[in-house]
């Protein structure tokens, strides 16, 4: 395992740990999820460059598409919860259930 791969895996696991620790605030959780998506993007890009397969070149772009969709939905949810309740606590999301 190279040093670059180890650093990317550590970044992913620290973002995962941050998601578990800061799960009470939606903004912190969204930032940690973005860190996870960034490390996944870098890892898939490195893997695509190492394998030099034409099929693998589409995976990093697909990862970016999913990250953009996740960020848009997260920001919309954060804006709605902040405007409605005045805070970004995740416990307020239980009130949004049907």
Curated annotation (Swiss-Prot):
Catalytic activity: a ubiquinone + NADH + 5 H(+)(in) = a ubiquinol + NAD(+) + 4 H(+)(out)
Purpose of the protein: Core subunit of the mitochondrial membrane respiratory chain NADH dehydrogenase (Complex I) which catalyzes electron transfer from NADH through the respiratory chain, using ubiquinone as an electron acceptor. Part of the enzyme membrane arm which is embedded in the lipid bilayer and involved in proton translocation.
Keywords: Electron transport, Membrane, Mitochondrion, Mitochondrion inner membrane, NAD, Respiratory chain, Translocase, Transmembrane, Transmembrane helix, Transport, Ubiquinone
Single GO term (MF): NADH dehydrogenase (ubiquinone) activity
GO biological process: one example: ATP synthesis coupled electron transport
Keyword Transmembrane set for record: yes
TM ranges: 2-22, 29-49, 61-81
Gene3D superfamilies reported in the protein's UniProt record: 1.10.287.3510
An annotated GO cellular component: respiratory chain complex I
Protein's UniProt name: NADH-ubiquinone oxidoreductase chain 4L
Subunit structure: Core subunit of respiratory chain NADH dehydrogenase (Complex I) which is composed of 45 different subunits.
Entry-linked Pfam families: Oxidored_q2
Topological relation to the membrane, as annotated: Multi-pass membrane protein
Subcellular location: Mitochondrion inner membrane
Main location: mitochondrion
Family assignment from sequence similarity: Belongs to the complex I subunit 4L family.
Top-level taxonomic group: Eukaryota
Enzyme Commission numbers on file: 7.1.1.2
Organism, as annotated: Oxymycterus rufus (Red hocicudo)
InterPro entries found in the cross-reference section: NADH_UbQ_OxRdtase_chain4L/K, NUOK/Mnh_C1-like
């Amino acid at each position: 395992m190279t040093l670059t791969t180890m650093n990317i895996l550590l970044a992913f696991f620290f973002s995962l740990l941050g998601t578990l620790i800061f799960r009470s605030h939606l903004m912190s959780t969204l930032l940690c999820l973005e860190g996870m998506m960034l490390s996944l993007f870098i890892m898939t890009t490195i893997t695509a460059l190492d394998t030099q397969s034409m099929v693998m070149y589409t995976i990093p772009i697909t990862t970016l598409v999913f990250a953009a969709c996740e960020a848009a939905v997260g920001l919309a949810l954060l804006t709605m919860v902040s405007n409605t309740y005045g805070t970004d606590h995740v416990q307020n999301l239980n009130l949004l259930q049907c």
